[in-house]
């Protein structure tokens, strides 16, 4: 994201709840989890990015030219620590954008990203602290963190932490094993090391704050 600017708000996104699907899967950590239907639409400034979606099908598309900050996508509310998010599609951007898993914790208030493709690396920002790396889903990810002071958030104007994993081998399809990232981040203070973090929403999203680009994605988990 663009540092010192929060690009998504819980109140700005529509949410419609649906029943979990019947199928189950075993996560990389070995925990059996039930796949759940998309029940949350992330739509912050989507009108500036031609955001279109089919919640039932789990698909969305967006196209932008020099937009204001926007974050759009599909996912779940609340999130959890063991979900494996699957995504596939296309993403192209000239600058200032990510394709990523995105979410928030309620307490401690925290914003997080697992960046799968990008035209701007948030860990390259001078305000970010690179603290380590994690290997997951066929690639190394750089880990960085940052503190936002007195900035808008899902709880109003607050000071809160941000955590990022940025994938070395960019991709437009695959699976994101969230537990691997959360466990790695906990070594650097994420969720104060809590075994069961207090999750707010959790989505696969496209974000941009400049440039031109487009994305079309299918999301499941």
Curated annotation (Swiss-Prot):
Induction text: Induced in presence of Zea mays leaves and by xylan, and repressed by glucose. SNF1 acts as a positive regulator through the release of glucose repression.
Effect of loss of the gene: Reduces the rate of xylan degradation and growth on minimal medium with xylan.
Recorded GO MF terms: endo-1,4-beta-xylanase activity
Subcellular location: Secreted
Alphabetized UniProt keyword annotations: Carbohydrate metabolism, Glycoprotein, Glycosidase, Hydrolase, Polysaccharide degradation, Secreted, Signal, Xylan degradation
Residues annotated as glycosylated: 117
Name of the top EC class for this enzyme: hydrolase
Gene Ontology terms: cellular component: extracellular region
Record-annotated GH11 domain positions: 23-220
Reaction(s) the record says it catalyses: Endohydrolysis of (1->4)-beta-D-xylosidic linkages in xylans
E.C. code: 3.2.1.8
Signal peptide per UniProt: 1-18
InterPro entries: ConA-like_dom_sf, GH11/12, GH11_AS_1, GH11_dom, Glyco_hydro_11
Pfam families named among the record's database cross-references: Glyco_hydro_11
Record-linked PANTHER family: ENDO-1,4-BETA-XYLANASE A-RELATED
Function: Endo-1,4-beta-xylanase involved in the hydrolysis of xylan, a major structural heterogeneous polysaccharide found in plant biomass representing the second most abundant polysaccharide in the biosphere, after cellulose.
Protein name according to UniProt: Endo-1,4-beta-xylanase 11A
Lineage: Eukaryota, Fungi, Dikarya, Basidiomycota, Ustilaginomycotina
